[in-house]
């Protein structure tokens, strides 16, 4: 017997109300929920009086003498509800008054476990098993408001307390193939607010969605590490793996709370191969103890590794909190690779706002992009020091000795890793006695380790307000003790960000780019060394008003000694060995780290532009031939875009700064950042020592104590350039050949249509036909080729006069798709053609056939640049056409075949409206010259008709078609983002071609069926035109 009560139901749609609402979780107070949708019903929790209801399809097996056994629920086609049970029996869960050695629920309809309560210390608010728990291939599975808590506590050291698993507790738990899983408002007194297992937990192959919301652990044993007992606000795998894999719907962990791991606690956690979005939001680790806090991992806590791989949807770690370390994740090492976009936003902790790395063993940490960016933004640390409150630091790394312990940062093509918060990598010495650390340390950092990583790793303060930047003071990005190598792709420092290399070498491969943007600073400290082989300056941002050039500098203060408040700072002026080594060229790049010549407006000259500065405290810190080693000629290889000449010039000045060891409090005005902003007034013509105000140390924070200080002289080398433009060469992928080719193609449509307007011998006819046109244009010279396919219909009416005059009125409509061969550029069109044809007989042997037509086209164009950039535009065109054909009839019979010579002139003229694109690299096209063509096929026509009924007729034409007059379409084109301009025209065509037409008809009394085929062949172009249909003839 199972104690159950009913729930009140009202029809609505699925439980996605909860899962989708999580996208705005911070606006939703789930504690206020009294109803939600589940399995196409809206559920409101109203408890009926307790009643005993016989459970359906429950099988007990392998029963033992002590009453234990295996429990299976399977094959139910109606919703099964297990609710309002209170169980105090040892070893059994809240919903079942029995001890199970295993529990399996498979192939059921909906299963609801609600308001069950387990008070004994063995755990399992709804279900407990001494072996495995398995939920397999069920429909919607819901655990709501189940509780495992309330056992009698026997003392301060009772480590055997087992109020585990607010909903489920077993040795292993497997949830596979279910349609949906929802665990809401469950609570345990020990680990696993919703689910707890002694070993592995596996959640796989869920069809629609997974939701863990508002689950809690609470532990009131007065034990010095109580948070260890209450870990895993939603899920706890006590000694093994938690795996969430191969699920098809969204996965949401929202508002869960635990002592460690606000959502998940495990030895290892793997989330991989899921297809939809994954969200960890508003989870919190709020453990407590009698001594120091160890509440780590606001969302996830593992003692070993955390793996996030091959997930297709967007992934969010948003607004998670830990009272100690790891606002989002606490783990031994991280493995983030090959996912969709990943966002770490608004997480907070006392140490490591995003990550706390405990380093239990040697490991490689991976932060690699997949198909989207990885973004770290507004992750904040909080401390008892109000001056430090609100600082944005991503990492906290435990200070234990592990080797090798490495980090790999990799951004794949067209993706980026954005560090908008401080990246501070430290405490990774091989041996703490090594001071300075060994430059050959195995605890390395590698940026873009393989050729597939051609994207960018970006350090930027773009998302930091001025108040936050002031609060940061001397704090900045740095790498300590880990030799760093940039192998491929780009490492960028932008938007006033600073990256300092402490104590170790930074090495760059020539296959990579080190890009510096506005206000960026690359600093090398004592015992450090910069080996730069390919330096780029992000020019468009530097040229904006109020922006300053980047700087590469030696830290004037020796940060290895005398850094405490009250100590006299030491400088690096005594170091005379090279610390900044150049061995390559200087490039000018844009915001995408590509050639600047085709992305910014360089149509006007620029004079005395500061683009880079290099600062040292001793002349020996640069190679003696550093100016020649850093190739500043700025002579780029042949390139598209603006052409011109750079004239570089180095200007050397000196200035003095005051060192100090003040705190980085907001009240301190002597931070490095402030010194850089206020210490010098510079003009390009000034080559003498600048007049520098002597900056005194501030007491800072109102403490009333002054800091000792010292002065150091800085030598500053500033690169000033002049630019003289001489022209613009367009990149063929941006040239717009397809636009001009579409105008020629419209003329070809007109020509094909006019050639088909040939009246027959009927007195009156109504005709309809389906049409297709295929065209293949070869690439010629540097112009792109294309292929096109169109389909449509045509209707016409013909009438004949008393003297052999014939009139034909035709209308056709077609849709056309064009695609360039070398690019993915496409154009789709609709054409509407109206034509009037007139046949006039002369001298009984000559027939003149004239026609006039108008073809109106609407076009949608899409251009692609790489994998992520594209532009689109709409325009229309008008084509006017005319033809005149002369046939010499009744003159050349060959048995029963009539051969008729003919000559024809075909005229077309196409004009487009102006075209303005939107999107990336948008262009503006305006007409300079319309496309005009006159061709004249000269050939012979053969006709044959049978004397039988129905009448069979064949007709064939062969002709040589020279081009008598040709004007290429010319479009003045402007690349809007940089004012680069050029003339767009079509792919060159052969001036001579051959034309053939064949037709076949079958005529009954008043019904005619026909099929026509035309082909035009030239060395540049091949076209095929087919129309087939029927006519009523009289």
From Swiss-Prot:
InterPro entries: Autotransporte_beta, Autotransporte_beta_dom_sf, Polymorphic_membr_middle, POMP_repeat. Keywords: Cell outer membrane, Cell wall, Membrane, Secreted, Signal, Transmembrane, Transmembrane beta strand. It is found in: Secreted, Cell wall; Cell outer membrane. Residues 1-25 form the signal peptide. It is a peripheral membrane protein. Residues 664-673, 680-709 have a biased composition (Low complexity). The keyword Signal applies. It holds the Pfam family Autotransporter. NCBIfam families: POMP_repeat. Belongs to the PMP outer membrane protein family. This is Probable outer membrane protein PmpF. It comes from Chlamydia trachomatis serovar D (strain ATCC VR-885 / DSM 19411 / UW-3/Cx). The gene is pmpF.
């Amino acid at each position: 017997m199972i104690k159950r009560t009913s729930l009140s139901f009202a029809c609505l749609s699925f439980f996605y109300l909860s899962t989708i609402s999580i996208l705005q979780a911070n606006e939703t107070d789930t504690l206020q929920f009294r109803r939600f949708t589940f399995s196409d019903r809206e559920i409101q929790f109203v408890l009926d009086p307790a009643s005993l209801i016989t459970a359906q399809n429950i099988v007990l097996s392998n029963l033992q003498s002590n009453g234990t056994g295996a429990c299976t629920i399977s094959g139910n086609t109606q919703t099964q509800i297990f609710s309002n049970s209170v169980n105090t029996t040892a070893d059994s869960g809240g919903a079942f008054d029995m001890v199970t050695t295993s529990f399996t629920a498979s192939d059921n309809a909906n299963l609801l476990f609600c308001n069950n309560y387990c008070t004994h210390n063995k755990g399992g608010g709804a279900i407990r098993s001494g072996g495995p728990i398995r939920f397999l291939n069920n429909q919607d599975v819901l655990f709501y408001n189940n509780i495992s808590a309330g056992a009698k506590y026997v003392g301060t050291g009772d480590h055997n307390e087992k109020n585990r698993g607010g909903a489920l507790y077993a040795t292993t738990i497997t949830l596979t193939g279910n349609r949906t899983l929802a665990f809401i408002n469950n609570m345990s007194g020990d680990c696993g607010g919703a689910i707890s297992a002694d070993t592995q937990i596996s959640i796989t192959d869920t069809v629609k969605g997974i939701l863990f919301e508002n689950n809690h652990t609470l532990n009131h044993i007065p034990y010095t590490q109580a948070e260890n007992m209450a870990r895993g606000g939603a899920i706890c795998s006590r000694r093994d793996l938690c795996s969430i894999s191969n699920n098809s719907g969204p996965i949401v962990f929202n508002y869960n709370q635990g002592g460690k791991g606000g959502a998940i606690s495990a030895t290892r956690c793997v989330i991989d191969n899921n297809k939809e979005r994954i969200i960890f939001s508003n989870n919190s680790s709020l453990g407590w103890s009698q001594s120091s806090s160890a509440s780590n991992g606001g969302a996830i806590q593992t003692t070993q590794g955390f793996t996030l791989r091959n997930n297709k949807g967007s992934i969010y770690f948003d607004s998670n909190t830990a009272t100690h370390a790891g606002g989002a994740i606490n783990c031994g090492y991280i493995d983030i690779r090959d996912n969709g976009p990943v966002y770490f936003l608004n997480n907070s902790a006392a140490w490591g706002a995003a990550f706390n790395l405990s380093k239990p063993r040697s490991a490689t940490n991976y932060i690699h992009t997949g198909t989207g960016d990885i973004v770290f933004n507004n992750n904040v640390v909080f401390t008892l020091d109000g001056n430090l409150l609100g600082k944005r630091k991503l990492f906290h790394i435990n200070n234990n000795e592990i080797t090798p312990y490495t980090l790999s940062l990799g951004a794949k093509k067209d993706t980026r890793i954005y560090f908008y918060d401080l990246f501070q990598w430290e405490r990774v010495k091989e041996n703490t006695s090594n001071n300075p650390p060994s430059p050959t340390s195995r605890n390395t950092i590698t940026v873009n380790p393989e050729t597939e990583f051609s994207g960018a790793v970006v350090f930027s303060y773009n998302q930091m307000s001025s108040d936050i930047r002031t609060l940061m003071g001397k704090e900045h990005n740095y790498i300590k003790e880990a030799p760093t190598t940039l192998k491929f792709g780009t490492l960028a420092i932008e938007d006033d960000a600073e990256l300092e290399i402490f104590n170790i070498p930074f090495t760059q491969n020539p296959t990579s780019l080190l890009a510096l943007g506005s206000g960026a600073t690359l600093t090398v400290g004592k015992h450090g060394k910069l080996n730069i082989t390919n330096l780029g300056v992000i020019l468009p941002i530097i040229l904006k008003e109020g922006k300053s050039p980047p700087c590469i500098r030696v830290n004037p203060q020796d940060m290895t000694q005398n850094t405490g408040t009250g100590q006299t700072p030491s400088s690096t002026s005594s170091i005379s060995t090279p610390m900044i080594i150049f061995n390559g060229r200087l490039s000018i790049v844009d915001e995408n780290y590509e050639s600047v010549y085709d992305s910014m407006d360089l149509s006007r000259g620029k004079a005395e532009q500061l683009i880079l500065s290099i600062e040292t405290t001793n002349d020996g810190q640069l190679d003696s031939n550093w100016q020649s080693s850093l190739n500043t000629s700025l002579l780029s290889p042949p390139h598209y875009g603006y052409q011109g000449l750079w004239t570089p010039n180095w200007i050397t000045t000196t200035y003095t700064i005051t060192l100090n060891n003040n705190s980085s409090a907001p009240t301190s005005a002597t931070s490095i950042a402030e010194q850089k902003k206020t210490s010098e007034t510079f003009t390009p013509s000034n080559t003498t020592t600048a007049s520098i105000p002597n900056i005194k140390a501030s007491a800072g924070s109102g403490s009333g104590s002054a800091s000792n200080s010292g002065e150091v002289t800085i030598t500053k080398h500033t690169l000033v350039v002049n630019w003289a433009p001489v022209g613009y060469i367009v990149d063929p992928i941006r040239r717009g050949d397809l636009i001009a080719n579409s105008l020629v193609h419209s003329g070809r449509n007109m020509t094909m249509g006019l050639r088909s307007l040939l009246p027959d011998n009927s007195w009156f006819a109504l005709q309809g036909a389906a049409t297709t046109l295929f065209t293949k244009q070869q690439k010629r010279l540097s112009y792109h080729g294309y292929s096109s396919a169109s389909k449509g219909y045509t209707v016409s009416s013909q009438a004949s006069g008393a003297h052999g005059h014939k009139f034909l009125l035709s209308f056709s409509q077609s849709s056309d798709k064009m695609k360039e061969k070398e690019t993915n550029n496409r154009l789709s069109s609709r054409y509407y053609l109206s034509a009037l044809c007139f046949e006039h007989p002369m001298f009984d042997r000559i027939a003149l056939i004239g026609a006039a037509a108008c073809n109106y086209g609407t076009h949608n164009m899409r251009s692609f640049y790489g994998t992520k950039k594209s532009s689109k535009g709409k325009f229309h065109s008008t084509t006017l056409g005319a033809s005149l054909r002369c046939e010499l009839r009744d003159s050349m019979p060959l048995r029963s075949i009539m051969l008729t010579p003919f000559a024809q002139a075909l005229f077309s003229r196409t004009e487009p409206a102006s075209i303005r694109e939107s999107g990336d690299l948008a262009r503006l096209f305006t007409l300079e010259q319309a496309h005009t063509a006159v061709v004249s096929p000269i050939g012979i026509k053969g006709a044959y008709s049978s004397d039988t009924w129905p009448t069979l007729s064949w007709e064939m034409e062969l002709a040589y078609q020279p081009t008598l007059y040709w004007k290429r379409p010319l479009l003045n084109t402007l690349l809007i983002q940089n004012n680069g301009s050029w003339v767009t025209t079509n792919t060159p065509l052969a001036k001579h071609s051959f034309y053939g037409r064949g037709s076949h008809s079958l005529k009954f009394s008043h019904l005619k069926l026909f099929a026509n085929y035309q082909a035009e062949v030239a060395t540049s172009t091949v076209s095929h035109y087919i129309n087939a249909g029927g006519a009523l003839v009289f």
